Amino acid sequence: MKVPKKPLKVFFNASVVIAGIISPSGGSGKLLELVTNKQIEGAISELILDEVLRHTDKIGRSQHAIEKKVRSIFSPIFPTPSLALINIWKKLVIDIGDAHVLASARSAKSNFLVTLDRKHLLILQEKVRKFKIVTPKQLIINKIRDYIDYSKA
């Protein structure tokens, strides 16, 4: 008898949330749908929500509508990680403004950090060991098929 796997826990960077809302049929949108359908456990922090809300002009909807949508997908939304944890990750990142993303993914006990930020986060794939940093496509193709219960689809 197969032992059920623990749910896949994925921390979302703001870039993926924004792309998923703009294009629900793309890879980022498919991941948001999997979170909504409870096929994977999705996580964001308050700082990620704030970043998404700062970019509502790219999405073309009101800030209120975007916040309502994001909160309906991700629950709970994790608090901002401690400054001590952020400082640990500052030593690794290229842009210190991204340290909170890695700290949040770690404090949320995520298996994966999904991002579209090639310049600052995906470049760290080989350096981070506590979780995997991947693109939506990498996560869908290489990881999710092992975790999804297709009977819920």
Residue spans of the language-model regions?
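Extended, non-globular alpha-helical segments
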Residues: L49-F74, N142-A153
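PIN/NYN-family metal-dependent endoribonuclease catalytic core
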Residues: F11-F12, I22, G27-K58
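Acidic, PIN/NYN-like endoribonuclease modules and their adjacent C-terminal/linker elements
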Residues: L49, N111, R118-A153
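Metal-dependent nucleic-acid phosphoesterase active-site entry motif
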Residues: M1-S25
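Short amphipathic alpha-helical segments and helix-helix/interface helices
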Residues: G29-E33, E67, V101-L102
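Active-site neighborhoods of divalent-metal-dependent phosphate/nucleic-acid chemistry enzymes
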Residues: P76-L122
